[in-house]
Amino acid sequence: MATQTVEGSSRSGPRRTVVGDFLKPLNSEYGKVAPGWGTTPLMGVAMALFAIFLSIILEIYNSSVLLDGISMN
């Protein structure tokens, strides 16, 4: 038998902790969706800037961008 029940065992509810009390208000908004686009445009700008950053790093790595005064072996 995979599960076993113990007769007369008392199981208390979830324990309250300081961290749990601190994080409880953050979880109270679970499942609620704000109407409209929200912060989607901001996320799009962040993704575009990150893509530009990655392309600059790739161009430097491939030496396709000339850097004056920096010698690369």
UniProtKB/Swiss-Prot annotation:
Keywords of this entry: Chloroplast, Membrane, Phosphoprotein, Photosynthesis, Photosystem II, Plastid, Thylakoid, Transmembrane, Transmembrane helix
Highest classification ranks of the organism: Eukaryota, Viridiplantae, Streptophyta, Embryophyta, Tracheophyta
GO molecular function, a single term: phosphate ion binding
Disulfide cysteine pairs (residue numbers): none
One Pfam family, short name: PsbH
Gene name per UniProt: psbH
Source species: Gossypium hirsutum (Upland cotton)
PANTHER family with a match to the protein in the record: PHOTOSYSTEM II REACTION CENTER PROTEIN H (PTHR34469:SF4)
Source species, domain of life: Eukaryota
Known partners and oligomeric status: PSII is composed of 1 copy each of membrane proteins PsbA, PsbB, PsbC, PsbD, PsbE, PsbF, PsbH, PsbI, PsbJ, PsbK, PsbL, PsbM, PsbT, PsbX, PsbY, PsbZ, Psb30/Ycf12, at least 3 peripheral proteins of the oxygen-evolving complex and a large number of cofactors. It forms dimeric complexes.
Listed name of the protein: Photosystem II reaction center protein H
Membrane topology: Single-pass membrane protein
Family affiliation: Belongs to the PsbH family.
GO biological process, one term: protein stabilization
Principal subcellular localisation of the protein: plastid
TM segment ranges: 41-61
Posttranslational modification: Phosphorylation is a light-dependent reaction catalyzed by a membrane-bound kinase; phosphorylation occurs on Thr residue(s) in the N-terminus of the protein.
